[in-house]
């Protein structure tokens, strides 16, 4: 669990080779923003949405993060290098910044609760 930290920002997304598409989800203590684009089709995102985050949602996200576990993960795949897809998660605040990149759809046991929340948010914004 992360202690309530208003400077914390969680970013996640996916990117696929051959201009197939990419998205990003940016979560802070006040806002959730989602952008999805298919670079091969247009420079204009197909989806660009944002909404305020509730205190309950923010607390659920904070409770889903074991920061020590996340900081110890060392995933750095490059499926996009061979026209595949990679998923990424970055966590940053005033004191730390760490990012991992892994094969799209892979569940990592130590961060599965966070991955589940990010997946739910992504589904919400894509519909």
PLM features per residue range, with description:
Residues 18-28:
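Short, solvent-exposed loop/hinge segments that bridge or flank secondary-structure elements
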Residues 32-33, 70:
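Primarily extracytoplasmic ectodomains and periplasmic/lumenal surface modules that are beta-strand-rich
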């Amino acid at each position: 669990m992360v202690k309530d930290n208003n400077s914390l920002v969680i970013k996640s997304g996916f990117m696929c080779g051959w201009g197939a598409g990419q998205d990003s989800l940016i979560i802070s203590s006040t806002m959730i923003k989602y952008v999805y684009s298919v670079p091969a089709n247009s420079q204009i995102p197909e989806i660009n949405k944002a909404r305020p985050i509730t205190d309950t949602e923010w607390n659920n996200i904070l409770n889903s993060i074991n920061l020590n576990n996340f900081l110890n993960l060392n995933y750095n795949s490059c499926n996009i290098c061979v026209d595949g897809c990679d998923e990424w998660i970055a966590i940053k605040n005033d004191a730390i910044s760490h990012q991992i990149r892994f094969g799209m759809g892979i569940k990592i046991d130590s961060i599965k609760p966070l991955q589940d929340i990010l997946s739910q948010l992504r589904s919400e914004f894509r519909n």
